[in-house]
């Protein structure tokens, strides 16, 4: 999870590719409509924006819930502050060939920072 938090703070795209599986899908509700982004679209959006680090934001994050279902499946609920908001995610993780990957991300802005 440290790498996940670092990716979102620094937007290190090499690290991004080591955290998010290439088949990962991102889900969120924007203006009342479901927003679905496959890996490539999410990667492009992250690469194009200014990072919280470059904006002088400090890292503020915590893991609210971790539930490992099996040797190959887990769910994590992190909360972090970035871009003036408090974000919560549900991350679906799968262990593939001994490495944990984020394979699904459901996100929501739950407040202001």
Where are these predicted regions, by residue range?
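Hydrophobic pocket/interface hotspot
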Residues: 4, 16, 24, 76, ...
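Short beta-strand segments enriched in hydrophobic/aromatic residues
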Residues: 20, 80-82, 106-107
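Surface-exposed, charged secondary-structure patches
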Residues: 25-31, 35-86
């Amino acid at each position: 999870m440290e790498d996940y938090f670092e990716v979102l703070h620094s937007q290190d795209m090499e690290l991004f590719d080591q955290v998010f599986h290439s088949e990962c899908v991102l889900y969120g509700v924007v203006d009342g409509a479901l927003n679905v982004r496959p890996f490539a679209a999410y990667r492009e959006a992250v690469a194009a924006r200014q990072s919280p680090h470059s904006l002088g934001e400090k890292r503020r994050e915590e893991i609210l819930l971790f539930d490992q279902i099996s040797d190959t499946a887990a769910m994590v609920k992190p909360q972090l502050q970035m871009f003036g908001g408090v974000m919560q995610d549900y991350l679906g993780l799968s262990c593939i060939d001994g490495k944990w990957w984020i394979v699904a991300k459901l996100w929501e802005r739950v407040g202001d920072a």
